């Protein structure tokens, strides 16, 4: 799991194409939520995160997933609100990813 996360971060660091369109960013958000869930489990197995902490991460991932679902459902009727929701959700996902990276380093 760490290899996957490091690979993704390396790709982003060298300037490879980042998701640009709403749908690309939405898909990247879903993928990152899935990755976040898997990383939390891996960190618990490696004894780098407590079970209670992992439950909290999973709950935050649930919130992020709900935000992505809401952004997707709003896209046709309220495009600007959908963009705003997607941007806010991306912030949550980035914070979760940063938190998990800090746990991996310990």
Per-segment meaning from a language model:
Residues 2-5, 10-106:
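Cationic, hydrophobic amphipathic alpha-helical membrane-interacting segments
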């Amino acid at each position: 799991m760490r290899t996957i996360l490091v690979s993704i971060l390396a790709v982003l660091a060298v300037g490879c194409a980042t998701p640009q369109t709403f749908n690309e960013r939405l898909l990247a958000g879903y993928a990152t939520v899935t990755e976040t869930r898997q990383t939390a489990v891996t960190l618990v197995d490696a004894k780098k995160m407590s079970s209670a902490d992992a439950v909290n991460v999973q709950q935050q991932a649930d919130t992020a997933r709900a935000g992505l679902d809401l952004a997707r459902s709003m896209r046709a009727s309220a495009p600007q609100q959908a963009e705003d929701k997607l941007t806010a959700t991306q912030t949550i996902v980035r914070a979760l990813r940063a938190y998990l990276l800090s746990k991996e380093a310990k």
